[in-house]
Amino acid sequence: MKLILTQEVAGLGGPGDVVEVRDGYGRNYLLPKRLAMPASPGAVKQVALIKRAREVREIRDLDQARALRDQLEALPVTLPARAGSGGRLFGSVTPDDIAAAVHAAGGPKLDKRRIEISGPIKTIGSHQVTVRLHPEVSATVSVEVVPAS
């Protein structure tokens, strides 16, 4: 089944991409959640026009993403979390927690889906987190997890 994505879908692509998926995945997941629309010839032409306009904006976005990367990498992010003896956290730090900590530290609001954690953060200390700002630009943010008082 050919579909046009209306939102970013992990493993498939971004908005405007024409993708070929299995019928069940498209019919039961992508279409009901409005993540995609059927790929008719008229819709494909319209998407091509939108993509051309997006390419012009993307050059500008790439410069903004690079500036944002520099800002994020220089930002000291401290995240207070409840911890027991030995420095182990009760639970773990989620991408949503990191996005809130970056915003509280004076950074921009980040989409939690763009934050990639290599493994669960369950200890106090400094941890490296990757933030995908643009398909070509990623920022590595140092998050200092401290015990909450």
Curated annotation (Swiss-Prot):
<dbReference type="InterPro" id="IPR020070">
    <property type="entry name" value="Ribosomal_bL9_N"/>
</dbReference>
<keyword id="KW-0699">rRNA-binding</keyword>
<dbReference type="InterPro" id="IPR036791">
    <property type="entry name" value="Ribosomal_bL9_C_sf"/>
</dbReference>
<comment type="similarity">
    <text>Belongs to the bacterial ribosomal protein bL9 family.</text>
</comment>
<keyword id="KW-0694">RNA-binding</keyword>
<keyword id="KW-0689">Ribosomal protein</keyword>
<protein>
    <recommendedName>
        <fullName>Large ribosomal subunit protein bL9</fullName>
    </recommendedName>
</protein>
<dbReference type="GO" id="GO:0006412">
    <property type="term" value="P:translation"/>
</dbReference>
<dbReference type="InterPro" id="IPR000244">
    <property type="entry name" value="Ribosomal_bL9"/>
</dbReference>
<dbReference type="GO" id="GO:0005840">
    <property type="term" value="C:ribosome"/>
</dbReference>
<dbReference type="Pfam" id="PF03948">
    <property type="entry name" value="Ribosomal_L9_C"/>
</dbReference>
<dbReference type="Pfam" id="PF01281">
    <property type="entry name" value="Ribosomal_L9_N"/>
</dbReference>
<dbReference type="GO" id="GO:1990904">
    <property type="term" value="C:ribonucleoprotein complex"/>
</dbReference>
<dbReference type="GO" id="GO:0019843">
    <property type="term" value="F:rRNA binding"/>
</dbReference>
<dbReference type="GO" id="GO:0003735">
    <property type="term" value="F:structural constituent of ribosome"/>
</dbReference>
<dbReference type="InterPro" id="IPR020594">
    <property type="entry name" value="Ribosomal_bL9_bac/chp"/>
</dbReference>
<dbReference type="InterPro" id="IPR036935">
    <property type="entry name" value="Ribosomal_bL9_N_sf"/>
</dbReference>
<dbReference type="InterPro" id="IPR009027">
    <property type="entry name" value="Ribosomal_bL9/RNase_H1_N"/>
</dbReference>
<keyword id="KW-0687">Ribonucleoprotein</keyword>
<dbReference type="InterPro" id="IPR020069">
    <property type="entry name" value="Ribosomal_bL9_C"/>
</dbReference>
<comment type="function">
    <text>Binds to the 23S rRNA.</text>
</comment>
